[in-house]
From Swiss-Prot:
EC number: 6.1.1.1
Protein name per the record: Tyrosine--tRNA ligase
Domain S4 RNA-binding: 353-419
Upper lineage: Bacteria, Pseudomonadati, Myxococcota, Myxococcia, Myxococcales
Single GO MF annotation: ATP binding
Organism expressing this protein natively: Anaeromyxobacter dehalogenans (strain 2CP-1 / ATCC BAA-258)
The keyword Magnesium belongs to this UniProt entry's keyword annotation: no
Domain of life: Bacteria
HAMAP family: Tyr_tRNA_synth_type1
Keywords from the named record: Aminoacyl-tRNA synthetase, ATP-binding, Cytoplasm, Ligase, Nucleotide-binding, Protein biosynthesis, RNA-binding
Biological processes annotated in GO: tyrosyl-tRNA aminoacylation
Length: 420
């Protein structure tokens, strides 16, 4: 069975590690955890490095623990933050925890010998009293030690509340609790979590005289220098209600050539050899972008499932060429309807409207005069066929699957009409 550290290093997924981790992994599989902040009801692609690390841990024989911060979520981690986060209610956090667990099921198995486990740190943090916490945790850390952490130093000028200042002690207590209760010996997280992770290892060492380990992932930025996972529209979410599967697919498909090798290593389970073969194919015919297509299909299928991915891929082909519209299913056209301008008409309305009326209705033309000029220049089409006259009408037999008609202006402007 592959060694976890070797697997992660081969994919450039390790930024830092505590001494002795390699020796510990050589002894056999390990139980490890990653913490997730439950301030939203969905993970986003910025969380996927952590999620993939848990998946690799399980593939290498280890037992992954997902710690959802129901307790720490009520405090707020200052790491990488310029201001204090809003405090959520217990009810909000519980709803978010349930939603996040459902998303993680796409990546790790909750069945079998080394089944993944979900833990909410509120279960143990709510049970400990202040005096007990100060006695059992606080006495093991000096204020100087806590002030030296980058997550704290970065906030000293702007101000940091005692609530956030104490966060590293609470996360340290998580690590100690999991070590005691579940023999968890590894915590993983982003590079900004290094201070919190080492605080936990320090607490375990001081209280139990044992060695536990930490591993962090690199900060992921794109070749253009922007933070990975951010678009003009904001974060790219795993929840289809927040980011549609089509937009999710397009996010990965639009990966810069300079980033695609790294993202294939980070976010797929393709072997290093398979990735090299994809890149060689891409070098022979860059226009087809096989590496980006495989990346987009692989990640979308894992997050949204293979059926949704097939519909999304087909919808993408409709807009960018390479498919027969008549063969498109109603599901595929429904995906498109959520991504391009659309209008719904009744059968009676369709019979009364010309194609020019429909083009104006969906916003592809400002007026019938614009349609006439566009038709003269062969600039409009209906279901892939160049429009010869704006006065034509769409018959029932002209409709695509599901009662759709696809209108097009130029090469890249589309709209759908749905007949109900």
């Amino acid at each position: 069975m592959q060694n976890l550290l070797e697997a992660l290093v081969s994919r450039s997924l390790v930024h830092d590690q505590t001494p002795g981790l390699q020796a510990r992994l050589a002894q056999g599989p390990i139980t490890g955890y990653v913490g997730f902040d439950p301030t939203a009801d969905s993970l986003h692609v910025g969380h996927l490095l952590a999620v993939m690390s848990l998946a690799w841990l399980q593939r290498c024989g280890g037992t992954p623990i997902i710690v959802v911060g129901g307790g720490t979520g009520m405090v707020g981690d200052p790491s990488g933050k310029r201001s204090e986060r809003p405090v959520l209610s217990v009810e909000e956090i519980d709803r978010n925890v349930a939603a996040i667990r459902a998303q993680l099921e796409r990546f790790v198995s909750f069945e079998g010998q080394n089944a993944a486990r979900v833990r909410n740190n509120a279960d143990w943090l709510r049970a400990i009293g202040l005096m007990e916490f100060l006695r059992d945790v606080g006495k093991h850390f000096t204020v100087n030690y806590m002030l030296a952490k980058d997550s704290v130093k970065g906030r000293m000028e702007s101000g940091i509340s005692f609530t956030e200042f104490s966060y590293q002690l609470i996360q340290a207590y998580d690590f100690w609790h999991l070590f005691r209760s579940e023999k968890c010996e590894l915590q993983m997280g982003g590079s900004d979590q290094w201070g919190n992770i080492t605080a936990g290892a320090e607490l375990v060492s001081r209280k139990d005289g044992a060695s536990v380990h930490g591993l962090t992932f690199p900060l992921l930025t794109t070749a253009s220098g922007t933070k990975f996972g951010k678009t003009e529209g904001g974060a790219v979410w795993l929840d289809p209600a927040r980011t549609s599967p089509y937009k999710f697919f397009q996010f990965w498909l639009n990966t810069d050539d300079r980033d695609v090798e790294r993202l294939l290593k980070f976010f797929t389970f393709l072997s290093v050899e398979e990735i090299a073969a994809l890149l060689a194919e891409q070098a022979r015919d860059p226009g087809k972008r096989p590496a980006q297509r495989r990346l987009a299909e692989d990640v979308t299928a894992r997050v949204h499932g293979p059926d949704v991915t097939r519909s999304v891929v087909e919808a993408s082909r409709i807009l960018f060429g390479g498919t027969d519209l008549r063969a498109a299913s109603a599901d595929v056209l429904e995906v498109l309807a959520g991504e391009i301008p659309s209008a719904t008409v009744t059968g009676d309305e369709l019979a009364a409207l010309t194609v020019a009326d429909l083009l104006v209705k969906v916003g592809l033309a400002a007026s019938k005069g614009e349609v006439r000029r566009g038709v003269a220049g062969r600039g409009f089409s209906l279901n892939g066929a160049v429009l010869e006259s704006g006065d034509a009408k769409v018959a029932a037999g002209d409709l695509l699957a599901g009662g759709y008609a696809l209108l097009q202006k130029g090469k890249r402007n589309y709209a759908l009409v749905k007949v109900r």
